[in-house]
């Protein structure tokens, strides 16, 4: 199947702990509209265990926890990443810049994040304020630079609220509404910027325990993947199998960068107009 054409920039927005059923017009109008007018699946799966460190490391390396070995916060396993082909390293080899936009992060987590990012190939980290809207605005500015490349934006309001009050509780849905402000900024990219926007989550939550997500359960494992922008099909709800491991190959292919043979996911070719037309 043909690969997607090259876009000038790509943005990956990770909304930590966002369940697909929280994406509804009364809570997340911007993300709901983006999903309804572009390509999406609400049946994608994250990795096992369904925890943030394992999922983010899979996004950073293109391989599952059984290969990368990082399932809990810590610096001991970082050396294993050097034996892999991290996404950021691979992009740098192909002269594609990468930037990361995050909110206010506690110092211990920021230190761990910097160590993980350095082991995964390195990228410029920019910290915004507490409001997800500021993260979205920061990522939008990075994505519109002449040397944009890949921008990764991360917000964790849903995860914090889920652990404190329960997934799909009123505070959780309020947090989802705040995260939608980041989407509102980034959604402006999809019209005329030759940019690809991918919105996803690292895990769900509330499947067994209302305030957690680490045990095996479909609600904990199911995540949304929404693709919008350059060359993406309109108004398609996919029922084909997809996983979080498909995101790195899809981003690379959209940026015109070859996908390493070691990557365990696939390009989501069915999301792109060119591939659908040739099928």
What do these predicted ranges mean?
Residues 1-279:
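Feature captures the catalytic ectodomains and active-site-proximal regions of enzymes
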